[in-house]
Every structure is written in C-alpha cells, then in structure tokens.
C-alpha cells in the first residue's frame, strides 16, 4: 500500500532461530534450496485462508513444544523438524502461487520477451554481451530468484536457457538474412 501517513497495525508471527541451532542438520543442508529468502518484499508469499490455517497450526504446535518442553534434548529435534515443516510448506505454497501466476499472468512472459527485444534493438549486446538473468529481472522489477522461479514454472525451463534460445534463434535469422550480428 502507498504510505498515506496513517498508522497501520499488522499482526502475525515471525519465525527466528539462531543459525547455530540448525548447523550440521538437514535444514542447514537444504537452506540453499529455499529461494524465497532472496525474494524482494513485493514478491511476498500470498497465502490462501487454508494455507494460513495450516501454518498457524504448525506454529501453535511449535509454541506449545517450546513452552512445555523447551530445553529438553528431544525437544530440539522436534523444534528443528517443525522449522523444516514450515519451510517446506512455504515452498509448497510458493509453487501454488507460481502456478497461479503462470495461469493468469502471461504478461510476465510478454514483458520478458520485450526486455530481450529492446536489449537487442538498443544494440546493448555490443557493449554488454548476452543479457543476463539478473539484467532481465531488474528490468521487470523482480529479484533474480523470484524471476527464475516464475519463468521455470511458466516455461518449464530456466530464464538462462530461454535467453540462450532467443540469442540462438536471433543469430540464425541474421545469418540467413546475411546481416551483421
């Protein structure tokens, strides 16, 4: 929402934990697979009511575990498993969100194509080479990870692969027309 000077009140919960708590565990080994930690704020996860209920139940169970058994050795493993459960649910819910984007928003693909067309129309390849995923994402005001995940969901391939195919097709067309690349 734009800032109109009125005070907003938000509610919810935040899951915070010391990195040492997960060091050497399955969670620490899987952290790189959770791309959503690198998304911009405008690429937030939008939960359905059912998804909110699922996460709230998990968090209630986690709070109960900490309140009643916190400090017990067996509790640490249960808490780690609950953290992993929250992370995996978030991955699932992002996958659903990407499917929704793919169904209802072909606009991102059109805009991606336009970014590539404009890049070559402006002859930026002469200075910068092949456009990068980071460049395309920034032109669309998206983080590279979010952009990559959306394109992967929409096209079944990475943005890098799509860019390579675009460049290859463009080069073939220029070679067939005897023009300079």
Language-model regions, residue ranges each:
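Amphipathic alpha-helical segments enriched in hydrophobic/aromatic residues interleaved with Lys/Arg
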Residues: 36-85, 89, 93
């Amino acid at each position: 929402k734009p800032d109109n000077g009125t005070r907003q009140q938000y509610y919810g919960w935040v899951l915070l934990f010391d990195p040492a708590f997960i060091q050497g565990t399955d969670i620490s080994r899987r952290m790189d697979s959770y791309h959503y930690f690198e998304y911009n704020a405008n690429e937030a996860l939008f939960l359905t009511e059912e998804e909110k209920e699922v996460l709230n139940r998990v968090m209630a169970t986690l709070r109960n575990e900490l309140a009643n058994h916190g400090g017990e050795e067996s509790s640490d493993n249960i808490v780690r498993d609950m953290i992993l459960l929250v992370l995996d649910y978030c991955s699932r819910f992002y996958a659903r969100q990407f499917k929704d984007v793919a169904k209802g928003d072909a606009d991102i693909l059109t805009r991606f194509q336009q970014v590539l067309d404009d890049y070559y129309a402006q002859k930026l390849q002469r200075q910068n080479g092949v456009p990068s995923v980071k460049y395309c994402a920034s032109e669309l005001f998206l983080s590279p990870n979010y952009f990559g995940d959306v394109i992967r969901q929409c096209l079944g391939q990475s943005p890098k692969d799509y860019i390579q195919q675009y460049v290859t097709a463009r080069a073939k067309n220029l070679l067939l027309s005897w023009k300079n690349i």
